Amino acid sequence: FQHALGAMHLATKAVHALRHQQVRISDDEAEALYACMLLHDLGHGPFSHALEHVFFPKNSHEDMSIALMKKLNTAFDGKLTLAIEMFTNNYSRGFFHQLISSHIDLDRLDYLKRDSFFSGVTEGNINSERLISMMMVKDEHLVFNAKAVYSIEKFLLARRMMYWSVYLHKTSFVAEELLIRLFDRAS
């Protein structure tokens, strides 16, 4: 829940930064982006990726997120249609999908910093505000100012270090394996 709010907060920062650079973003587009960031991990089961294949053996969490968003869209009389188009990369302005899901997206900007803080590992402490301030749109695609090269390198290195230090750490693997065995035994 905190991650969804954090990712949405970064979306508000990105919209503000891009509008400041004269990128035309309507209020409907901004709201759709915010909805995407709030709902992007809706398809995750408990314990995130660790039990994804246990609960949804035939679908990824992204597939489940889309299915749940479509159900919500029906309940909300189509108010999430634009958000679903952005989420599934079916919207004409591709930079919105890039903000939601790409190599440097708002999701990653939030979870790297958040996971770094809560794990006590400093490698993931990135300057997301600076990266967002360096975002630009060219031909409806997300690009970065040339001055962002160092920040992008730091982000990519931080992501790799977080995988080595936290996500792929032996303790994480053991904890995931214990969870999987518990659920296998219970079923």
Predicted features and spans:
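Sequence-structural signature of the catalytic-core scaffold of metal-dependent phosphohydrolases
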Residues: 1-35, 43-187
